[in-house]
């Protein structure tokens, strides 16, 4: 063997050793190492790392969220009917500090022992104590939450650091004849719910109309009450105005009557003071003086009457007095 061949062999072995020693850990993973089949306590984070070639191996363990799918899980109900869950998804993640302990106890494929097998066991436990009606319809909406809580409770004691984030369970497959019956039953149930909701809507609309009618009636009653109150106030105002006008009219009439009475009283008092014997005598003389016919002679008293035979002077004097009184009345 030539020196060049030996050098090439050494370089090839060295290159293979370097290639075997250098490895990469992806982000979101933790590297665990085995030497001679024994798990080493050392772990590594993301990046490039070196290890002893040929005698040391590594495995990358994911610590971010991952979804484990458990497929075609058989489940026997309490009534003896066999059903199958097509797919159950378990969303979980591993705390990086717990990687070494979980890998040591359950290997790097820990999800098979802690998740897959546990899901099979818990589902069969659930189905065995419930009827098909409960599993398929009645309690189906609770299966995922109950399964999550049960898994997490067991993992907390068995493998602390493995966290169950969510569990999703698909509708189980049941025998075709039973499925058709359930579909018919669900259809009738849906129709019943629709009818019930329709009835509630009708009742709600009727109640709304009734409330609207009550509100409208109350509104009309309030408006009528307000108008009635306005009319009453108007009538009371008119009554007060009429009373005031009547009082004013009575006051005016009373004042007028009092004034007329006072005027008549004062005139009577004035006439009483005025009509003295002397004043009457004076007025008689004025009346005589105002007469345009004046007679001279001894027969003056006869100027007020016909000068017939047998007339006396006393009659003439009375006629003069009457004439004087008539003149006073004219004044």
UniProtKB/Swiss-Prot annotation:
Positions of glycan attachment: 105
Q: What is this protein called?
A: Erlin-2
Q: Which organism is it from?
A: Danio rerio (Zebrafish)
Q: Write out the GO cellular component annotations.
A: endoplasmic reticulum membrane
Q: Name one GO molecular function term.
A: ubiquitin protein ligase binding
What is its membrane topology? Single-pass type II membrane protein
Q: Which InterPro entries match?
A: Band_7, Erlin1/2
Family annotation (SMART domains): PHB (SM00244)
Task: Quote the subcellular location field of this record.
Answer: Endoplasmic reticulum membrane
Residue ranges that the UniProt entry lists as topological domain Lumenal? 24-331
Respond yes or no to whether keyword Transmembrane is given for this record: yes
What role does this protein play? Mediates the endoplasmic reticulum-associated degradation (ERAD) of inositol 1,4,5-trisphosphate receptors (IP3Rs). Promotes sterol-accelerated ERAD of HMGCR. Involved in regulation of cellular cholesterol homeostasis by regulation the SREBP signaling pathway.
């Amino acid at each position: 063997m030539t020196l060049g061949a030996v050098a090439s062999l050494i370089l090839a072995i060295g290159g293979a050793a370097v290639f075997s020693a250098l490895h990469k850990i992806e982000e979101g993973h933790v590297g665990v190492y085995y030497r001679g089949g024994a798990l080493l306590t050392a772990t590594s984070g993301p990046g490039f790392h070196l290890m002893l070639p040929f005698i040391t191996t590594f495995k990358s363990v994911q610590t971010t969220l991952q979804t484990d799918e458990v497929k075609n899980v058989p489940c026997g109900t309490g009534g003896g009917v066999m059903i199958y869950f097509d797919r159950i998804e378990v969303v979980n993640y591993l705390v990086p500090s717990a990687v070494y302990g979980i890998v040591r106890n359950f290997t790097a494929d820990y999800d098979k022992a802690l998740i897959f097998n546990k899901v099979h066991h818990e589902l069969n436990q659930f189905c065995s104590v419930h009827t098909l009606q409960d599993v398929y319809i009645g309690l189906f909406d609770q299966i995922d939450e109950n399964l999550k809580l049960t898994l997490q409770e067991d993992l907390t004691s068995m493998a602390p650091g493995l966290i169950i984030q969510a569990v999703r369970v698909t509708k189980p497959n049941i025998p075709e004849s039973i499925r058709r019956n359930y579909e018919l039953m669900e259809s009738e149930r849906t129709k019943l719910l629709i009818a019930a909701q329709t009835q509630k809507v009708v009742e709600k609309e009727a109640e709304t109309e009734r409330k609207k009618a009550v509100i409208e009636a109350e509104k009309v009653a309030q408006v009528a009450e307000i108008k009635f109150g306005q009319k009453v106030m108007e009538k009371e105002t008119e009554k007060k105005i009429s009373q005031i006008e009547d009082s004013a009219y009575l006051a005016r009439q009373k004042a007028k009557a009092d004034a007329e009475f006072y005027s008549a009283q004062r005139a009577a008092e004035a006439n009483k003071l005025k009509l003295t014997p002397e004043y009457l005598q004076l007025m008689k003389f004025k009346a005589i003086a105002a007469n345009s016919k004046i007679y001279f002679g001894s027969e003056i008293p006869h100027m007020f009457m016909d000068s017939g035979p047998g007339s006396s002077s006393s009659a003439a004097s009375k006629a003069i007095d009457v004439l004087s009184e008539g003149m006073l009345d004219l004044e």
